[in-house]
Amino acid sequence: MTHSLVCPETVSRVSSVLNRNTRQFGKKHLFDQDEETCWNSDQGPSQWVTLEFPQLIRVSQLQIQFQGGFSSRRGCLEGSQGTQALHKIVDFYPEDNNSLQTFPIPAAEVDRLKVTFEDATDFFGRVVIYHLRVLGEKV
């Protein structure tokens, strides 16, 4: 059964937050299921989100909802187990719109993920994400 794998024990980190305003634009808004809140990165050549899960997971899908005009043309999902180095799982290519986009992921058993957003549609390299979901199952 596929379900959301991000839980309260999942540790998340992000590359940046717009104007360091974590209250309004922080990483917690990626997972709060609120249509009114978002993570807004600061400017830069690429942005990323890392997730450390409390147990081994098998990822099957990645869901992302960007704000149109502040999306990424190319993304990379990397993962690892324990202290191993991250390895590339898959590249994905989001569309520049406001829709929730689903990307199938080749079966990967990991406890750490890194999602990197490259080639932002915004001139300054900012990325705005309303929802980030990792779907799959616990191993």
UniProtKB/Swiss-Prot annotation:
Signal peptide: none annotated. Expressed in all tissues examined, with highest expression in heart, skeletal muscle and pancreas. The keyword Nucleus applies. Transmembrane segments: none annotated. Keywords: Nucleus. InterPro entries: Galactose-bd-like_sf. It is found in: Nucleus. One of its GO terms (cellular component) is nucleoplasm. Interacts with NR2C2/TR4. May act as a repressor of NR2C2-mediated transactivation by suppressing the binding between NR2C2/TR4 and the TR4-response element in target genes. Belongs to the NR2C2AP family. This is Nuclear receptor 2C2-associated protein. It comes from Homo sapiens (Human). The lineage of its organism: Eukaryota, Metazoa, Chordata, Craniata, Vertebrata. The gene is NR2C2AP.
